[in-house]
């Protein structure tokens, strides 16, 4: 069966809304507050698998989970001036308690650098207590004024993993940035999500950071989505809160910090990146259900009962071997109707069991990504399912990476860059001298967003000149249409 991706690529926004609704992943647009949605049971399980994975990776590197209050006093938020300027217009403020006006406005947490640094002034006094590595998985709130989109641009980001670390020296914090990058690389690799890493330009780094490294991916409509960030904060926040620690030589100094975050966007990408016109295709790493069994009724009622019993036995074997499996016993739907809904949901494997399979002591297994099937004897069931799931995982990952690579272009002509971006090129790289003035000019001329310069594996531009000033290029600047 030939699988098409026309809706997926050419009308992605509609496709995405259709999938999250019909697959019962996320209910968006009906809750009576703009920019806030509801995780439905199936979607919540997908979300939980991602949360469990990031917890495992952070815990393995010595991070400790905490849980801070939702409300942040205004004076705390304003303590680091550059930080609050970066998103003051996006803050939700609580101004009343019951009928009483509050003396100090309270912000619904937009991020937690200020709150955590404030508490660390009580917790940390000596280098012997360092490094500190905290993280929490919470809701954060931003008053988005642009058009909101489910999971992608929200006013309540309900799956915000933020890590915050404290270090004696700049170099220690620098090493932590590299560790955070490796954690995220492992996270995205495990989920099969392709990415590029860029150092954000000075004018677009995190407010209060020395520098920001961002992970971006390309969505089916060729727009770029930021899926993770890592910030070296230096001493900006520790100085603002007068947080000093005793160093090894007995002197007092301000420690250095990092922070790094990911959000619901990871789930949006996982649902989208390998989809087709039949629905989403979930990696076995995230799929709450690894296999769905569809019993095919026989003409004879007694034989149909035997098919159901046989299906239950097959499910029991798989579940007992750690492969989460369900049987669709809905008698109101035809097998074809069942195929339709489980394909939308992206369940990796479909197991069809009818009279033929019953008589031959076998099952017929179809992969969701290809809809190609094979007949498997019952005694080989577990080994074949394990093999198919692993092959499917690898194939999905390879396909996603191939899609991303096909969407990265290079040109040394600014007008050509604009044309490429207008024709859904994805990411376009141009030679750049690294000056802010030229970078802003490139952004203005193309009407695109500057992602920054490559963090790793940069192109050789030693013989190129900046597309604006024509001075020798030092690196490339990445441009894209973004969300």
UniProtKB/Swiss-Prot annotation:
Listed EC numbers: 6.1.1.15
Entry keyword set: Aminoacyl-tRNA synthetase, ATP-binding, Cytoplasm, Ligase, Nucleotide-binding, Protein biosynthesis
Q: According to its UniProt record, what is one Pfam family this protein matches?
A: tRNA-synt_2b
Q: Where in the cell is it found?
A: Cytoplasm
One Gene Ontology cellular component term attached to this UniProt record is: cytoplasm
User: Is Protein biosynthesis among the key words of this record?
Assistant: yes
List the SMART domains hit by this protein, alphabetically.
ProRS-C_1 (SM00946)
Its biological purpose: Catalyzes the attachment of proline to tRNA(Pro) in a two-step reaction: proline is first activated by ATP to form Pro-AMP and then transferred to the acceptor end of tRNA(Pro).
Tell what the record comments on domains: Consists of three domains: the N-terminal catalytic domain, the anticodon-binding domain and the C-terminal extension.
Task: State the name under which the record lists this protein.
Answer: Proline--tRNA ligase
Per the UniProt record, the lineage of the source organism begins with: Archaea, Thermoproteota, Thermoprotei, Sulfolobales, Sulfolobaceae
């Amino acid at each position: 069966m030939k699988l098409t991706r026309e809706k997926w690529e050419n009308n992605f926004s509609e496709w995405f809304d259709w999938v999250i609704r019909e697959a019962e992943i996320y209910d968006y647009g009906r809750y009576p507050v703009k920019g806030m949605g509801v995780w439905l049971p199936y979607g919540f399980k997908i979300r939980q698998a991602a949360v469990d994975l990031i917890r495992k990776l952070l815990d393995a590197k010595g991070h400790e989970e905490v849980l801070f209050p939702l409300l942040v006093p205004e004076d705390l938020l304003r303590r680091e001036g550059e930080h609050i300027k970066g998103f003051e217009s996006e803050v939700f403020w609580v101004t009343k308690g019951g009928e009483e006006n509050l003396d100090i406005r309270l912000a619904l947490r937009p991020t937690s650098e200020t709150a955590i640094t404030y508490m660390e002034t009580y917790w940390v006094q000596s280098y012997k207590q360092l490094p500190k590595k905290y993280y929490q998985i919470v809701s954060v709130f931003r008053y988005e004024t642009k058009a909101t989109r489910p999971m992608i641009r929200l006013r309540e980001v309900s799956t915000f993993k933020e890590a915050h670390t404290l270090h004696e020296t700049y170099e220690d914090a620098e090493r932590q940035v590299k560790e955070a990058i490796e954690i995220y690389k492992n996270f995205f690799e495990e989920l099969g999500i392709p990415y590029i890493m860029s150092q954000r330009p000075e004018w677009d780094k995190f407010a209060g950071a020395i520098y920001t490294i961002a992970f971006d991916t390309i969505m089916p409509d060729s727009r770029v989505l930021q899926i993770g960030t890592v910030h070296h904060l230096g001493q900006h926040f520790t100085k603002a809160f007068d947080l000093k620690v005793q160093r090894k030589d007995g002197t007092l100094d301000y420690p250095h910090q990092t922070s790094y975050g990911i959000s619901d966007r990871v789930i949006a990408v996982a649902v989208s990146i390998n989809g087709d016109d039949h629905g989403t295709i979930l990696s076995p790493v995230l799929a709450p259900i690894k296999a769905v069994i569809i019993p095919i009724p026989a003409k004879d009622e007694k034989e149909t009962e035997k098919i159901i019993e046989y299906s239950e036995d097959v499910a029991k074997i798989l579940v007992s071997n750690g492969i989460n499996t369900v049987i669709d016993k809905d008698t109101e739907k035809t097998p074809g109707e069942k195929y339709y809904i489980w394909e939308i949901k992206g369940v990796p494997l479909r197991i069809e069991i009818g009279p033929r399979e019953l008589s031959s002591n076998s099952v017929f297994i179809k992969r969701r990504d290809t809809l190609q099937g094979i007949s498997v004897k019952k005694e080989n069931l577990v080994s074949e399912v394990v093999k198919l799931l692993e092959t499917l995982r690898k194939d999905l990952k390879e396909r996603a990476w191939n899609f991303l690579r096909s969407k990265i272009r290079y040109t040394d002509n600014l007008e050509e860059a604009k044309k490429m971006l207008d024709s859904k090129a994805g990411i376009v790289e141009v030679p750049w001298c690294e000056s802010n003035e030229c970078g802003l000019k490139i952004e203005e001329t193309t009407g695109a967003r500057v992602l920054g310069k490559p963090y790793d594996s940069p192109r050789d531009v030693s013989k190129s000149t900046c597309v604006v000033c024509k001075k020798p290029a030092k690196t490339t600047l990445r441009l894209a249409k973004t969300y």
